[in-house]
């Protein structure tokens, strides 16, 4: 099991986590004690990070299976306490899951871009499909300029390359 600092030293993992939880979340991971489970209040005190930021970070990490909690009930008050610990060993599963979601979106976009012809307004930049351009008689509905054909081959090729790269990283090839 890698330490929190070793995991954060990986630039790709750091960028992934930073996008997910921001600066304070990264600091929480850096300062998160590994000796036992901690309540969110204890973590805020130990790490000197705002309690709301600690909670938001923990919930986000939990959603990605990068943190887990154990719930205990105080029999006298009936209050529940959540004891948290990090599960950063699940990092690569989390990244893979998110990449699968991105891959599906890119595939849909690729299909849309490759199956349609587009027209663009040189004045305002509005872009529409051939079908919509025909319906509007190739006149921009925003500024009433004439629409011109827009060659999206560059975008289609870029999407194709990105999809291939992600598929290769995920072992789909």
Swiss-Prot record:
GO terms for molecular function: DNA binding. It comes from the Archaea. Keywords: DNA-binding, Transcription, Transcription regulation. InterPro entries: TF_E_archaea (IPR016481), TFE (IPR039997), TFIIE/TFIIEa_HTH (IPR017919), TFIIE_asu (IPR002853), TFIIEa/SarR/Rpc3_HTH_dom (IPR024550), WH-like_DNA-bd_sf (IPR036388), WH_DNA-bd_sf (IPR036390). The keyword rRNA processing does not apply. Belongs to the TFE family. The winged helix domain is involved in binding to DNA in the preinitiation complex. Monomer. Interaction with RNA polymerase subunits RpoF and RpoE is necessary for Tfe stimulatory transcription activity. Able to interact with Tbp and RNA polymerase in the absence of DNA promoter. Interacts both with the preinitiation and elongation complexes. Transcription factor that plays a role in the activation of archaeal genes transcribed by RNA polymerase. Facilitates transcription initiation by enhancing TATA-box recognition by TATA-box-binding protein (Tbp), and transcription factor B (Tfb) and RNA polymerase recruitment. Not absolutely required for transcription in vitro, but particularly important in cases where Tbp or Tfb function is not optimal. It dynamically alters the nucleic acid-binding properties of RNA polymerases by stabilizing the initiation complex and destabilizing elongation complexes. This is Transcription factor E. It comes from Methanospirillum hungatei JF-1 (strain ATCC 27890 / DSM 864 / NBRC 100397 / JF-1).
């Amino acid at each position: 099991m890698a330490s929190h600092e070793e995991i954060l030293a990986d630039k790709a993992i750091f960028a992934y986590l930073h996008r997910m939880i921001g600066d304070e979340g990264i600091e929480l991971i850096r300062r998160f004690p590994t000796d036992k489970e901690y309540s969110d209040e204890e973590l805020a005190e130990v790490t000197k990070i705002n309690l709301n930021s600690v909670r938001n970070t923990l919930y986000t990490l939990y959603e990605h299976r990068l943190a887990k909690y154990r719930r205990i009930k105080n029999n006298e008050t009936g209050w529940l306490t959540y004891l948290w610990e990090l599960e950063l060993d699940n990092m690569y599963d989390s990244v893979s899951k998110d990449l699968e979601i991105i891959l599906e979106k890119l595939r849909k976009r690729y299909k849309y871009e490759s199956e349609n012809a587009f027209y663009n307004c040189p004045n305002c930049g509005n872009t529409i499909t051939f079908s919509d351009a025909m319906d509007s008689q190739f006149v921009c509905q925003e500024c009433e300029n004439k629409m011109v054909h827009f060659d999206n081959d560059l975008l289609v090729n870029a999407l194709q390359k990105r999809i291939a790269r992600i598929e290769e990283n995920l072992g789909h090839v």
